[in-house]
A protein has these predicted regions:
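Short loop/turn positions at the edges of beta-strands in beta-sheet-rich folds
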Residues: 20, 138-140
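Substrate-binding groove/exosite segments of carbohydrate-active enzymes
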Residues: 7, 110-133, 140, 144-147, ...
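Polysaccharide-binding surfaces and accessory modules of carbohydrate-active proteins
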Residues: 1-107, 130, 157, 161-208
Length: 256
C-alpha cells in the first residue's frame, strides 16, 4: 500500500556468524550524526530512550521552529535488549575522537561516551552510536536489527515565489520516533508485504529486460528525487543535485 511504501525509514538486519571453533563475544554498531537543519546545524539534542520493547537514540533540533523546512527529527532504534551506546564522542581533542573510539570500542565492544541527553553548540553536529552485543557459540548465527527513521515534515518551494507546506509524512507522523515505533510494531506485516511484492514482480512473465529496467530504477522512490504533497499527491523532480532538485514539475518525459 502507498502509505507503508512511503515510510521514511531504513531497516538494517545484520547477520553475524561465528566461523571459529571458540565462543565469540561481539558488537555490531551504527553511528548517526545529528545534522538536522543542515546547513544551519547546531542546538540539536541527542537523547536515549528505553520503552521496554525497544530502545535507542532520538535526535531533535531546538534551533528551528516546527514550521520551518529545516525542522525535523531522526531515530535509531532496535528491539534487541543487550546494547551499548553513547550520545557523542568522549571529551577529548577533536583529532583524537575517532582514534579513541576505535581503541576503546575495538577492545571492549562497549561505548564509553556520554549517556545523558546532550544539546550541541551552534554550528556543531554530535555523532551518536548504538551497538548491539551478541555471544555466539561455534557455528552459531544471529541477526540483529536496527531501524533508522527520519521525518522532515515541511516542504519548501524555494524556486520562484517561496512557499512552505506540510509533506504527506508530516500529516501522518509527529516524529521520527513514532515512525520507527510503527515499523517495529508491524515488522512482520511490512516484511511480508515487501517480500510478496518482490516475489510477484520477479516471477512475472514480463521480459527480463523490462524486469531489469523497472527494478534497477525502483530505488529512486526512496530518495529526495520524489516527495508526496500534503494531500498525498506524488511529486517528482527530473533528478537531484547535491542540495536541490533538478527540473521541477513531474515532467512527462521522465515520469510517464
Amino acid at each position: 500500500n502507498d502509505d507503508d511504501s512511503s515510510l521514511p525509514v531504513a531497516i538494517f538486519d545484520v547477520t553475524l556468524t561465528n566461523v571459529t571453533e571458540k565462543k565469540v563475544k561481539t558488537t555490531v554498531a551504527l553511528g548517526l550524526q545529528n545534522i538536522l537543519g543542515l546547513p544551519e546545524i547546531g542546538k540539536s539534542e541527542n537523547r536515549w530512550i528505553d520503552k521496554g520493547s525497544h530502545r535507542g537514540i532520538v535526535m531533535t533540533t531546538q534551533r528551528h521552529d516546527q514550521d520551518s523546512p529545516r525542522f525535523g527529527s531522526m531515530a535509531l532504534l532496535t528491539p534487541n535488549d543487550d546494547v551499548t551506546y553513547q550520545l557523542n564522542f568522549e571529551e577529548t581533542h577533536w583529532f583524537r575522537a575517532t582514534e579513541s573510539l576505535m581503541d576503546e570500542f575495538g577492545t571492549t565492544g562497549e561505548f564509553m561516551g556520554p549517556k545523558d541527553s546532550l544539546v550541541c553548540p551552534e554550528n556543531q553536529a554530535y555523532v551518536a552510536h548504538l551497538g548491539i552485543k551478541a555471544e555466539l557459540a561455534p557455528g552459531e548465527s544471529v541477526t540483529k536489527t536496527f531501524v533508522l527513521a527520519w521525518l522532515t515534515p515541511n516542504f519548501e518551494k524555494y524556486w520562484g515565489e517561496r512557499h512552505v507546506w506540510k509533506t504527506y509524512q508530516g500529516t501522518k507522523w509527529d516524529s521520527a520516533e513514532s515512525v520507527a515505533e510503527y515499523v517495529l510494531e508491524n515488522m512482520p506485516k511490512l516484511e511480508g508485504q515487501t517480500r510478496k511484492f518482490a516475489n510477484t514482480f520477479f516471477s512475472s512473465t514480463l521480459p527480463t529486460y523490462v524486469l531489469d529496467a523497472v527494478s534497477s530504477q525502483m530505488s529512486i522512490l526512496r530518495t529526495p528525487t520524489v516527495t508526496r504533497l500534503t494531500d498525498g499527491t506524488f511529486y517528482g523532480w527530473e533528478g537531484c543535485h547535491i542540495n536541490s532538485g533538478c527540473c521541477e514539475g513531474t515532467c512527462t518525459h521522465v515520469w510517464t
